[in-house]
Amino acid sequence: DALIGVSMTGIASGVVLGLNMRKASDVVKRENTRVAKLIGINKAARCTTVKPAGTTSLVLGTSSGIHAWHNKYYIRRLRVGKNEAIYSYLKSNHPELLEDDYFRPHDTAVISIPQSAPKGSIIRTEKVMDMLERVKLIASEWVKPGHRAGSNSHNVSATVSVKSDEWKQAG
């Protein structure tokens, strides 16, 4: 069974929610059919998914997967080995973004990347039901239409934080 999972990220950045996701999932399935035929394999039974995309979201400047931005402004921190190419590059070109890791200063650094959520983005102060409705929308408009066959479909990977006063509503 061939398997691909074309994922979306940056959903809470505000642009994706205005797009026709069913049409996009059809494009994914058509392209999968074309490429599978071209390389001589079966087309995938499941084509679309949503998963968190930490590094990808940093590179693209988007929110991660389906998740809201942490806040309007914040600092995102990543640990990297001092033997990695990104460390050497930043040390030479942007040393202000680097600091030694507290626990492993001899071989690990922390990169601090300022973040700014774009205007119109969803931030984590949203209500839990808004998050759950977004998951439901993406599951029904992107993930399910990208499913061709079999009893198991891909899913929307999400961590849902429920505040103490939201448990009754969330169920």
How would you describe each model-predicted region?
Residues 45, 58-59:
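Short capping micro-motif at the N-terminus of alpha-helices
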Residues 3, 8-52:
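Internal maturation/activation junctions in enzymes
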Residues 1, 52, 59-171:
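Catalytic alpha/beta core of large soluble enzyme barrels
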